[in-house]
Amino acid sequence: MFGYVKINKMDLTFREYDYYKAYYCGLCKYLKRNHGEISRFSLNYDITFLIVLLTAVYNPESISTEEVCIVNPFKKKKVITNDITEYAASMNILLTYYKLEDNLMDDKRIKDKLAYYIYKNKLKLAYEKYPEKAEYIKQQLNELNKLEKDKNINIDEVSSIFGNIMGEVFVYKKDENERNLRMIGFNIGKYIYLLDAYEDLDEDFKKGRYNPFIEYIDKNDELKEKVKKIKIGRASCRE
């Protein structure tokens, strides 16, 4: 479901792009060192954006190093990490684990089962550091699963649940930035859910799986209009 929040490389300077890659590599390295090699398979651009955004807001002290990469072991790359990297990595683990747990309620695919039990061993560290966020993510995914089981096709209502999850993830601290960061995360969460549902529509229809857009399977123009009218920006702020 993740991976939709990407940069437009053409709009960045060379220096900006190098820094973006350095934060991405920092997340990758941190996941490997603290949660194991397997955790890097869950690496995504959405969480990298979270690091860049929160770093810009809070300006924590960062460590910049030059390290080799498994993709290119003969050339060192810039790697940037800070306290936000640790937080984002923990959120990445929590989101991946609970999403896999949610998937097992529906499909019970072998690859999901395997990944779930592997990530179960990685969950402890992230849960111990952020138990309230972990419980909130789990509770919201349970609510989402309930709506999906009921075949709820109110896309605004359904996507708002995932918006709530990402809104909570984007709140790093309880301070004056909380409301704005929650709203940004909420909007991004709805955006991710909508795009994922839209892209999966044909496959979900063929396999008889739930999709909130299922009634528009042969109505592409109507579906586009419906998506345009969905209210992005109405967060249910958790204070």
Q: Where are each of the predicted segments found?
A:
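Acidic catalytic motifs of isoprenoid enzymes
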Residues: 1-183, 190, 194-228
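Residue-level detector of conserved catalytic or cofactor/ligand-binding positions
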Residues: 231-239
